[in-house]
Amino acid sequence: MSLSGAHKAAFRREVTQEGQVFAIRDANGFPAPADDEGRRAVPFWSKPTRAQLVVKHVTAYGGFEVVPIPIEEWLGDWMVGLEHDNLLVGINWAGARATGYDLTPGQVLRWFAELEPTAAADERIHSVQR
């Protein structure tokens, strides 16, 4: 498994255990840097310590604060908003350049729906795909 794949697997496991995700923001809001192909992603982490390492070691994110987001809010409002804005979801970015695995909001919802045996997950997927 690649390092990005390992971060992806850890993300789902840890978010499920923690019940929340972690983002970073500064006075300008949440970052959404573009990759080499121009696609933008908002990064999220499964543990505050992962996000804190990026803030501490990646110059571009110096001064950002780590913000917890309850998983229900993240899978609901956040995924709808990211889909609307055509943004990807960065998963446990790490390293000197804060890079990693990116998913579409729909992929994230399907990924977490596998763990959630309720109709609520299906409804969120359908609302994002509309």
Give names to the regions the model predicted:
Residues 1-130:
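Conserved NAD+-utilizing ADP-ribose enzyme module
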